Design a protein with these regions (language model features):
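Sec-dependent signal peptide hydrophobic core
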Residues: 12-26
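C-terminal motif of bacterial Sec signal peptides marking the signal peptidase cleavage site
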Residues: 29-33
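Secretory/export targeting leaders with adjacent low-complexity proregions
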Residues: 260-270, 278
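Extended amphipathic alpha-helical segments with heptad-repeat/coiled-coil character used for oligomerization
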Residues: 272-326
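Long, charge-rich alpha-helical interaction segments
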Residues: 330-360
Length: 411
């Protein structure tokens, strides 16, 4: 037993240096991604970088299939995740914090453990999302800005790589999801920099920040202020934020199915001081905000609340919208975190009677996008997306480059 404990401790100590965020053979997904002045990758992007913790040939083939969607700029990549990422085992593992997620990845997705170089990173987040029908086609849409301000120890902004991850698990639903590579210490250009260990690409299915599946169900996560969520209901297994999102994309076809799944688990996060809420929508036009609440801000949020509504709850940013949190410092009445963005989103939806085209939706995201000159402490817009839930398609711009888009489709 002592040897087993020593082995696990060695695994944890090795993996703790790799930054992780919050939480089967695949078919090739259809992807178009280019602009007039870029040369999209027609195949895997060549690299000399090693994956030192991976020995299995199928895993290595998958890692070396990564594609740079701008040729060789190192800003946005695509991967087909073609090996088993063992979701059912992850759900039974009881992943409840960053450390237990690291342990799961080490024990189940890696082949060997070595020490890796770490970075000192600070970050601030502030995201935006909304849902509405398309006024011309009748398709259902979801808009999303992912805002995250990665900084190094000298407070310089760290440029990130976006990674689009296609999955098609045996017995589960096909999906495409999006990952901020900096959460595993990857900077822009990491794949061909000659030094980054590519092993942490094995963790990608559990690092998603938003995504859509074959049924047109989409989910995103947004930051809240305050203590991290810690549910402790008897008889329920614990689940970490991004593991929950992976579960929803793999198993839920609608918002209602997603809500039923979430209710079976104790949600847990460990980022201090921060919690999260989910914004989700589906191809039937349903949408919801899921929050974990506790009006006593000295305690951890522990009550799951489901919130829907045509006006105030059709969009969301970074404060609690649950009435139970309304009189707290982090609720709608007093919080300033994302309030201006929320007002812009709500007004934009109201003015269009909650009916927008995809282009109008992207313009609305543009209005609430954040750069170095605005809301410095709450985020930096890394990517903006319009999800067409009906067509299972995502149109993305990165870094507020609105004239250049990347399109992803789940078939």
């Amino acid at each position: 037993m002592r040897k087993v404990t020593k082995h696990l401790n060695g695994i944890i100590n090795a993996m703790v240096r790799c930054q992780l965020y919050v939480a089967s053979v695949a078919m090739m997904m259809s992807l178009t991604a280019c602009s007039d002045d870029d040369e999209p990758a027609s195949g895997p992007t060549p690299t000399q970088n090693e994956a030192k913790m991976v020995l299995d040939k199928d895993k290595l083939a998958m890692i070396y299939s990564l594609r740079d969607l701008e040729g060789n700029k190192g800003r946005i990549y695509e991967m087909d995740y073609t090996v088993d990422y063992k979701l059912d085992k992850a759900l039974n593992f009881g992943i409840h914090d960053t450390q237990s997620l690291k342990m799961f990845v080490a024990l189940n997705l890696m082949d060997t453990i070595i020490s890796t170089k770490s970075m000192n990173i600070s970050y601030d987040a502030g995201c935006s999302a909304f849902a509405c029908p398309d006024k011309t086609s009748g398709d259902y849409l979801m808009g999303r800005n992912f805002d995250f301000n990665h900084k190094d120890q000298n407070s310089n902004r760290i440029p990130i790589p976006v990674i689009a991850v296609h999955t098609a698990p045996a017995g589960g639903k096909k999906s495409v999801s999006f990952v901020d590579g900096q959460f595993v210490d990857y900077k822009s250009g990491f794949y061909t920099d000659g030094e980054s260990d590519l092993s942490m690409l094995m963790a990608l299915p559990y690092l998603l920040l938003d995504g859509i599946n074959e049924n047109g169900f989409a989910v995103s996560v947004l930051k809240l202020d305050g203590n991290p969520t810690q549910q402790q209901e008897t008889g329920k297994k614990k689940i970490f934020t991004t593991v929950a999102m992976r579960m929803l994309l793999d198993k839920a076809g609608t918002v209602q199915e997603a809500l039923t799944l979430l209710d079976k688990y104790n949600m847990c996060t460990d980022n201090v001081p921060a919690s999260y809420h989910f914004f989700m929508a589906d191809a039937k036009g349903d949408y919801a905000i899921v929050e974990y609440t506790n009006p006593n801000l000295d305690e951890n949020p522990n009550k799951m609340e489901i919130l829907t509504g045509n006006d105030t709850l059709r969009c969301v940013t970074n404060f609690y919208v649950a009435p139970s949190m309304g009189e707290t410092a982090h609720g709608m009445k007093y919080s300033s975190h994302g309030m201006e963005r929320y007002k812009i989103l709500r007004q934009g939806l109201q003015e269009k009677n909650y009916l927008l085209t995809s282009d109008e939706g992207m313009n609305l995201l543009k209005k609430v996008a954040q750069g170095p000159e605005s809301e410095l402490t709450t985020g930096f817009t890394q990517w903006s997306e319009m999800y067409n839930l009906t067509k299972r398609r995502v149109t993305m711009s990165i870094l507020r480059e609105w004239d250049k888009t990347f399109s992803f489709e789940v078939k």
